[in-house]
A protein has these predicted regions:
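C-terminal interaction segment
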Residues: 2-33, 70-83, 90-110, 114-134, ...
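Acidic-basic catalytic patches of nuclease active cores, encompassing PD-(D/E)XK
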Residues: 36-81
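A structural signal for short, well-ordered beta-strand segments and their strand-loop junctions
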Residues: 61-63, 141-144
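Short acidic/polar active-site loop segments enriched in Thr and Asp
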Residues: 138
Length: 241
């Protein structure tokens, strides 16, 4: 005979721990433009040269003017705008909406802030302290695109930032990247100015993607010229081929 009132076992509810938010769940755009067009160009110059440098590596990410999340408390209020430029090594390549340290597994290895009248004091004090004591960024630099004499670099040593001294060539070396940050007098996006960009330890500028394409085109033209001269020496008209 079937029991009309079967006894069912009542189980205690299981509460799963709340997982921290990911980059897809966090704000990644504050709608605020950079301080000036030159600031934007300087950021793009740094990013572009870093991207060509990263082509030689299987890992690495470079970003700029994007949110950097370093604590769960920070997610409750948008109280910190991300670095103007940063590099992270030892991580898979690929696009990110924002940099979420607990999702990616590590923070930036190098940060550069571009100074402006409205941000310089913060970049030199509270942000520097944040990068040093909370996020613990190994190397931190700042530069003023309109006052190029105002630049500095710091390296984390013993838990504190120590100034990076300019070398004999006037550059600030990055031990993390194995590159040097140099001042470059030149034209970028129709602006003639003093910029900062990366150079190799031998002093060769790391090219942007556009510069790299020009170099490739020039090399191809030189090869074609050598071939044409060789054919002419053999009595062959290269234009007739």
């Amino acid at each position: 005979m079937t029991n009309p009132n079967p006894i069912t076992e009542v189980l205690d509810p299981v509460y799963l721990p709340e997982l921290p938010p990911t980059q897809d769940e966090l704000p990644y755009d504050d709608g605020e433009p950079m301080e000036s067009w030159r600031h934007r160009c300087q950021m793009d110059l740094l990013i572009s040269t870093t991207q060509t440098w990263l082509q030689q590596r299987p890992d690495g990410f470079v970003g700029g003017n994007m949110f950097l999340y370093y604590s769960l408390e920070q997610t409750s209020g948008r109280n910190f705008k991300g670095p103007d430029y940063f590099v992270v090594l030892g991580v898979p390549k690929g696009e990110r909406k924002s940099w979420v340290i607990w999702e990616q597994g590590k923070g930036p290895d190098v940060v550069i802030e571009l100074l402006a009248p409205s941000t310089a004091q913060e970049d030199k004090t509270s942000k520097k302290q944040l990068y040093e004591q909370i996020i613990r960024v190994p190397e931190y630099f700042w530069f003023d695109p309109f006052e190029p004499e105002d630049w500095a670099g710091f390296r984390l040593m013993g838990g504190r930032y120590e100034p990076i001294q300019e070398d004999a060539e006037g550059c600030l070396p990055s031990e993390v990247l194995g590159l040097c940050l140099v001042k470059w007098e030149g034209r970028f996006r129709d602006i003639e100015a003093t910029w900062i960009r990366w150079a190799t330890a031998a002093g060769e500028l790391v090219p942007t993607e556009a510069e790299l394409e020009r170099q490739r085109a020039e090399q191809a033209e030189q090869r074609a010229g050598r071939l044409a001269r060789k054919l002419q020496e053999l009595g062959v008209d290269p234009d007739a081929l």
